[in-house]
Design a protein with these regions (language model features):
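Conserved alpha/beta enzyme-core scaffold
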Residues: 1-194
């Protein structure tokens, strides 16, 4: 809302285009990882995904699980050589997911559009993030959201997203059954990712 700003410049030509990211192709390996990850995400849980092909693959797999659970389960079964491991999830999302992520990316938009990103935190937000980065379509989605829906996406300081301090009890409750999905450049012998 305009009341949150000191100055607003409204004139043609004063609206530079936001930097948008290209969509990278999603490999077969990314899709396979995405299916496995989606089976580990609990209904009513919390999700963090990053930008790039792996985040896109996880998003696609979660949508498949929600909208075509039989196809999802069969795909997972085949990836697991005939038997789905115990404890894996294959059912649609009833309660839905909440997201806590430094970066608000296209994948969260898709999960919201498909009725998956819908579990509200204590403050009513379905997502807390520190910044956003995405495609032109993602930016259009954000611009065109009605105010009431826009309020579901709460942009906060990075420290709010990354730390429990300050509102620890509420953040722990909000971030139940969290799954954090990222890629790394390398892993050390002790398991640290860089």
């Amino acid at each position: 809302p305009a009341r949150r700003f000191f100055h607003i410049l409204e004139t043609q030509g004063a609206e530079p285009r936001l930097f948008s990211t290209p969509k990278q192709p999603v490999s077969d390996a990314d899709h396979a990882i995405g299916i496995h990850v989606a089976s580990l995400v609990r209904d009513g849980g919390t999700l963090q995904i990053g930008i790039g092909s792996l985040g896109d693959a996880v998003t696609a797999a979660l949508v498949m699980r929600h909208e075509a659970p039989d196809v999802f389960a069969e795909t997972l079964r085949r990836l697991c050589h005939g038997e789905i491991p115990q404890g894996r999830e294959t059912q649609p999302f009833e309660t839905g997911l909440y997201a806590a992520s430094e970066m608000f990316v296209d994948g969260f938009m898709e999960l919201y559009r498909h009725g998956i990103l819908k579990r509200k935190a204590g403050d009513g937000a379905v997502l807390h993030a520190g910044f956003f980065l995405g495609t032109e379509a993602f930016y259009s989605f954000l611009r065109e959201l009605p105010d009431k829906e826009r309020d579901l996406f709460s942009m906060r300081g990075i420290s709010f997203v990354n730390e429990l301090f300050g509102e620890e009890a509420q953040k722990r409750a909000d971030r139940a059954d969290a799954r954090f999905v990222n890629t790394a450049m390398m892993a050390t012998l002790l398991g640290e990712t860089i």
